[in-house]
Amino acid sequence: RFKKIRRLGALPGLTSKRPRSGSDLKNQLRSGKRSQYRIRLEEKQKLRFHYGLTERQLLKYVHIAGKAKGSTGQILLQLLEMRLDNILFRLGMASTIPGARQLVNHRHILVNGRIVDIPSYRCKPRDIITTKNKQRSKALIQNFIASSPQQEELPNHLTIDPFQYKGLVNQIIDSKWIGLKIN
């Protein structure tokens, strides 16, 4: 995990740790000129590791984004940001996207009153995301919400009620709220 961060820069979805500033200078001195292939590969790897996708999943999302009207890159980022695991991460119900995936896989999360155990579930506007009405589920979410830093601003397409352990998807995400810098 830390090798990936050193190589690709900060990946907030993978871990809250940041690369040291000195290691970045060493990499720039050692690397020389970066080819177009290398730049594209690094950007693709950033997407994969930040969102926790396999190569095949990313290719499917690129294919869907290519068929849709509009900028393929923007639509791809919208598709990735509207995944259930990513929305839990953005709401602050999980510290990382892998942590959010585990919450979903262990059936702690309800979407519109139904258990969803698929982390790649594509959320739609007006979806209500809650925790299961069990003490253990609520305790897990409460720990994440309490330990998450409150200075992070919530994206305008999401709202959260931390006392009821409930989040709401208001609309499709705006491109300025995407936290990952992709070239």
Curated annotation (Swiss-Prot):
Keywords linked to the UniProt accession:
Chloroplast, Plastid, Ribonucleoprotein, Ribosomal protein, RNA-binding, rRNA-binding
The entry assigns this protein to a family as follows: Belongs to the universal ribosomal protein uS4 family.
Task: Cite a single Pfam family from the UniProt record.
Answer: S4
The protein's matches in CDD domains, at most eight in alphabetical order, are given as: S4
Give the principal location in a single coarse category: plastid
| Complex formation | Part of the 30S ribosomal subunit. Contacts protein S5. The interaction surface between S4 and S5 is involved in control of translational fidelity.
What protein does this entry describe?
A: Small ribosomal subunit protein uS4c
Q: What is an example of a GO molecular function annotated in this UniProt entry?
A: rRNA binding
Q: List where in the cell it is found.
A: Plastid, Chloroplast
Q: Which PANTHER family match?
A: 30S 40S RIBOSOMAL PROTEIN, SMALL RIBOSOMAL SUBUNIT PROTEIN US4M
| Positions of the S4 RNA-binding domain | 82-143
Q: Name one GO biological process term.
A: translation
Name the NCBIfam families on file: PRK05327.1, rpsD_bact
Supply the PROSITE patterns for this chain.
RIBOSOMAL_S4 (PS00632), S4 (PS50889)
Gene Ontology terms: cellular component: chloroplast; small ribosomal subunit
